[in-house]
Structures are given as C-alpha cells and as structure tokens.
C-alpha cells in the first residue's frame, strides 16, 4: 500500500481544509513546490494534488503550480484533481507530465464522460468519489447527490478506470481515523483498485487499513497528519512495505 502525501492548492498556496469547507482552511506553505520536495525527499512514491479553487470553479486555477511540480519530478507519479471537466484539461495535464487525472463532479453528473476520457487517455484516469453517509457529493462537496458510492463505482468497472479515490467527507481534515469499514466494502464490491482518503491521523490508522485485509486498497492519501506531524511519511511507508498481517 502506498502512502500518498496530499498537496491541496488554494490561491497558489498549500492548505488543508476541514470537511471540505473553503472558509475553514489552514495555510501550511506559500511554496507548494518546496512542500512537494519535502515529501519526495521523505521517500513518497506518489503525490496527490488538488486544485481547490478549480474544484469550485469547474476549471483549473492552480495549473501553473501543478505543472511546476510535475516538471521538477518527471519520474514521480502525480495525480491531480479539482476542476477536471473536459478532455482539453486532461490533455493539458498529461502533456505537462501528470500521471493521473482525477475526475470527480463530472463523473457523477455525466458518467459517460469517464468512458470517453478512458478511451482518449488510457491508464490515466482516476475517479474521485467523495461521500457523505454513503452518498456521493459534488462541486467541491457543496452538493450531496442521491447516488450511492458503491453503485456508481460498479458502473465504471468496464471503462478502464485506473483507481477510485474514496473520501469520507465527515472524516476529512478531522484526523479522527478514516472510514475503514466502508473503504474495505467498496474495495470488495468493485474490481477497481481503491485509494483511501480522509481522516488519517497516525500509524494506527494505516495499520487499520492494512488489517482490513482488502487487497483492493492500494493506497492511502494523507494531508493534515503529515503537516501537523502526527504521521511520518517515511515511517508509514516502511510500515506498509514490511506489513505481514
């Protein structure tokens, strides 16, 4: 399982939100590229970038920062989400050196777009499913739909999606542990690999994910915990690598 540091971008800075609320943000760095360097030097094997402004505006806003990080680390897998709602945007990021694009809101509102994106950019598409009480949320988590996460995930199995990033909104940024039972249930219900996100606080939460014995869980995204020092990236990755269960 990969430990994937998150770099959330708002107005060019690296921030963290609580439960997806833009008004409840903490700025951790004015230099996201240097922050990326910190996690790379700490041994991370993938980075998770989010254009928060883009998620709300429906188009990339912090694209220059994303491109700068991708150019600095051409051999590091980078995934980007937030405001990706057109093939042109995906093409821009792929050409910039980004490994994966995360389709969120558009995947819920126009599921057929995911199939189209997978055909145009095979192996590059991840679907981001953000949920509240098992129902998918959209538009920067501002809207909660009537669509159930597992039902939607199954729909994407035939499209060639590389992974699903599952985030429990109630847990995100709260550092109270991630929703392990639902994450494991999602991984068991679909053939698509699952990346857990939201609420990871310490090594105990990483162990809980591993203890779930769900082979479909391939990664865990962590944000506030690594910025506030309750989780060490290198230690957590080493723990995953040596885990025997």
Swiss-Prot record:
This is 1-(5-phosphoribosyl)-5-[(5-phosphoribosylamino)methylideneamino] imidazole-4-carboxamide isomerase. It is an enzyme of class 5 (isomerase). One of its GO terms (cellular component) is cytoplasm. Pathway: Amino-acid biosynthesis; L-histidine biosynthesis; L-histidine from 5-phospho-alpha-D-ribose 1-diphosphate: step 4/9. It comes from Pseudomonas fluorescens (strain ATCC BAA-477 / NRRL B-23932 / Pf-5). The keyword Disulfide bond does not apply. InterPro entries: Aldolase_TIM, His_biosynth, HisA_bact_arch, Isoase_HisA-like, Isoase_HisA-like_bact, RibuloseP-bd_barrel. It catalyses: 1-(5-phospho-beta-D-ribosyl)-5-[(5-phospho-beta-D-ribosylamino)methylideneamino]imidazole-4-carboxamide = 5-[(5-phospho-1-deoxy-D-ribulos-1-ylimino)methylamino]-1-(5-phospho-beta-D-ribosyl)imidazole-4-carboxamide. It is found in: Cytoplasm. Belongs to the HisA/HisF family. GO terms for biological process: L-histidine biosynthetic process; L-tryptophan biosynthetic process. Keywords: Amino-acid biosynthesis, Cytoplasm, Histidine biosynthesis, Isomerase. Transmembrane segments: none annotated. GO terms for molecular function: 1-(5-phosphoribosyl)-5-[(5-phosphoribosylamino)methylideneamino]imidazole-4-carboxamide isomerase activity. Its EC number is 5.3.1.16. Pfam families: His_biosynth. The active site is at residues 8, 130.
């Amino acid at each position: 399982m990969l430990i994937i540091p998150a770099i959330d971008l708002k107005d060019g800075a690296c921030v963290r939100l609580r439960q997806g609320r833009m008004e409840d943000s903490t700025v951790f760095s004015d230099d996201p590229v240097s922050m990326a360097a910190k996690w790379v030097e700490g041994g991370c094997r993938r980075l998770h970038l989010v254009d928060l402004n883009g998620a709300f505006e429906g188009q990339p806003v912090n694209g220059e920062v994303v491109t700068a990080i991708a150019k600095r680390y051409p051999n590091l897998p980078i995934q980007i989400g937030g405001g990706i709602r057109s093939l042109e945007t995906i093409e821009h990021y792929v050409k910039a050196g980004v490994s994966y694009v995360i389709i969120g809101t558009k995947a819920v509102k126009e599921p057929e777009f995911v199939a189209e994106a997978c055909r145009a950019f095979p192996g590059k598409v991840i679907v981001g499913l953000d949920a509240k009480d098992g129902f998918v949320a959209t538009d920067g988590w501002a809207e909660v739909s009537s669509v159930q996460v597992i039902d939607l995930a199954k729909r994407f199995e035939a499209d060639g999606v590389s992974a699903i990033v599952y985030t429990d909104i109630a847990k995100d940024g709260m550092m109270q542990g991630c929703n392990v039972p639902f994450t494991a249930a999602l991984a068991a219900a679909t053939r698509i690999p699952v990346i857990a996100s939201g609420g990871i606080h310490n090594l105990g939460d990483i162990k809980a994910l591993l203890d779930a014995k769900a082979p479909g869980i391939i990664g865990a995204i962590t944000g506030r915990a690594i910025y506030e020092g309750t989780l060490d990236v290198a230690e957590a990755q080493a723990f995953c690598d040596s885990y025997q269960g």
